[in-house]
Amino acid sequence: MLLENNQLIIVDIGASGGIDTRWKNLTSYFKCILFEPDPREYSILKENSDSNLIVLNSALSDSNKTVEFHLCQKQEVSSIFPPNFDLLNKFPDSERFKVQKNIRLNTDTLNNQLIKVGVNEVDFIKIDTQGYELPILQGSYDYLDSVIGLEIEVEFVEMYKGQPLFDEVDGFVKSKNFSLVDLKRYFWKRKGTGNTTNKKGQLIFGDALYFKTPEQILAISNINQEKIIRSIYIYLAYGYVDLSQVLLQEAKNINLLTEEVFTSLVKTLKKYEKNELGKSFRLRKKISNLLHKLSIIINLDEDYSFGTDQKIGN
């Protein structure tokens, strides 16, 4: 296996619910460092941890400081920023944002935390911290040069008071040589708007997927064969076979890959190309979209989020 002695290093910040299953589906050769400041969820993650995972009960920011963390009724929406009920009360189920308790946390930077656990390089970072993504990114600068991809929750309206919005986060990430490749959008409809089942509401937030392009990867200082291999697998984790193909060929053209590794990667990509062919029929996509719409119509509790994209990546 190409990753057997060259494991992926993944960081998951705001790790409620555990690591994305896409990584375990991709390979068993990875290490993931999970950060979860909410003591309720941290205990669950720690209990279910395995040898691939390092679970840390640390709050991250752009510096060392003390912050107030708002523990909400629904654990997943807890945030350092207070909920903005002037906005949230216009939409259904705002009660889940009700703050049950405030706790004070000492923050640290991702730079410092990764040094403490002996991680020198990272391949992928996912951040879902309810509006606090930008300060965390600003405290990660030592590692961003080596990172291939980012999945970041972004908001288009102020769900939390004082939070940075998409344009600020997007500007910072692009300044670090990442390109936006996909956006899973979440739409909400206003309360009490009657039968609007098949109509989208307002764009509220999303999950943004950023990659370094093949050209940007090849421009990384001290780029080597091992990093090329991991980069290709990062692309494949999200279904971007085309980016994998381009990176593979360009790396071969400048003699970054041995013939043995190149041949092995070609075989790997052929498997994914076959999978893509099986997914390419338009009828399958139409049926999938129809079933998604029917599920929302049947489950009226989810009606306010009609139009939300089903997934991120291919």
Locate predicted features.
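Phosphate/nucleotide-binding beta-alpha loop and adjacent structural elements of enzyme active sites
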Residues: 1-314
